[in-house]
Amino acid sequence: MSGLFITFEGGEGAGKSTQIALLASHLRNHGFDPVITREPGGSPGAEAIRHVILSGNAETYGPAMEALLFAAARADHVDQLIRPALAEGRIVLCDRFIDSSRAYQGVTGNLDATYMAAIERIAIDGAMPDLTLVLDICAERGLSRAGKRRGSDTADRFEKEDIAVHEARRQAFLEIARQEPARCKLIDADRSQEKIADEIRSVVDTILTEKGLL
């Protein structure tokens, strides 16, 4: 795959969607045509599964079944959108990917790491991110942001969970970033949007320069 695959990870209210939009604008200013996508979702099949997951209907079947649903959505997303875009040399910006499954289903769902690694390997079939930006913010602050962003809309099932669960996920993301420093860049998300965006642009521009694309 000849393109560049960048994923954004972090807890609720970390600002992933905002930073994806800002980075996409920056890339367009440099002549790129980035693909913006999300998980769960990003392809027709994956979006159908997204509705089942976020509605809470999947909770009935337990975390193992839910992890398989995420994996099925991811496999379709990779095959239908991500892999073809990368083959065309596009830059793909994805809101959540494998690390969210590791944190949400693996850690707080108490699923075995071997089980999670097996379904991850099948779902992505080699489509690992070139760069993962882990936006870090304490759980309480992130949930406050998410509530303000949501306004009068109903919180999804993940936002409704206890603060301790959200903090456990935060620690899971931090551990992933610590274990995979070559892929993951930890970003302090408890700052202004502009400062966060500046750091992200710097990281991405460095990679593009190294690849001779900028």
UniProtKB/Swiss-Prot annotation:
Look at the named UniProt entry and state the broad enzyme category this protein falls under. Answer: transferase
Catalyzed reactions per annotation: dTMP + ATP = dTDP + ADP
List where the protein spans the membrane: none
GO CC terms in record: cytosol
Name the domain of life this protein comes from. Answer: Bacteria
Residues annotated as binding ATP are 10-17
Q: Does the keyword Glycosyltransferase apply?
A: no
Cited InterPro entries: P-loop_NTPase (IPR027417), Thymidylate_kin-like_dom (IPR039430), Thymidylate_kin_CS (IPR018095), Thymidylate_kinase (IPR018094)
Record's keyword terms, sorted: ATP-binding, Kinase, Nucleotide biosynthesis, Nucleotide-binding, Transferase
EC number(s) for this protein?
2.7.4.9
Question: Which SUPFAM superfamilies would you find in this protein's record?
Answer: P-loop containing nucleoside triphosphate hydrolases
Which BP terms does GO give this entry? dTDP biosynthetic process; dTTP biosynthetic process; dUDP biosynthetic process
State the protein's purpose: Phosphorylation of dTMP to form dTDP in both de novo and salvage pathways of dTTP synthesis.
Q: What is this protein called?
A: Thymidylate kinase
Q: In which organism is this protein found?
A: Brucella suis (strain ATCC 23445 / NCTC 10510)
Source organism lineage? Bacteria, Pseudomonadati, Pseudomonadota, Alphaproteobacteria, Hyphomicrobiales
The gene designation is tmk
